[in-house]
Amino acid sequence: MDLLPRERDKLLIFTAALLAERRLKRGVKLNYPEAMAYISMEIIEGARDGKTVAEMMDYGRTLLTKEQVMEGVSELIPEVQVEATFPDGTKLVTIHNPII
């Protein structure tokens, strides 16, 4: 199967996000790449479901708390930028202070 680099990136994010989701269910704290992948996947999937950019920006701030990530991870992620495909095209979603 031949995939474009962007498609490979999305699959890699999705795979890491699934791992993060499983770890969250077990109560394991997420590291930096897992937290980034988890937030990114939720934004990408919300866009595919027809949500708006504004809804995704708000939703992105509700996904993780400092208690769900390893020490120092929340400080490493002051913002997350995700390029997602919405019904009206591809847009950049920026989430400021995603881990509260």
Swiss-Prot record:
Pfam families: Urease_gamma
Keyword Cytoplasm: yes
Pathway the protein takes part in: Nitrogen metabolism; urea degradation; CO(2) and NH(3) from urea (urease route): step 1/1
InterPro entries the record matches: Urease_gamma, Urease_gamma/gamma-beta_su, Urease_gamma_sf, Urease_subunit
Reactions listed under catalytic activity: urea + 2 H2O + H(+) = hydrogencarbonate + 2 NH4(+)
BP term (GO), one: urea catabolic process
Keywords: Cytoplasm, Hydrolase
Enzyme Commission code(s) on record: 3.5.1.5
GO cellular-component term (any): cytoplasm
Gene Ontology MF annotations: nickel cation binding; urease activity
Cellular localization per UniProt: Cytoplasm
Residues that span the membrane, as ranges: none
Family membership: Belongs to the urease gamma subunit family.
NCBIfam families (UniProt xref): PRK13241.1, urease_gam
Subunit organization: Heterotrimer of UreA (gamma), UreB (beta) and UreC (alpha) subunits. Three heterotrimers associate to form the active enzyme.
The protein's name in its UniProt record: Urease subunit gamma
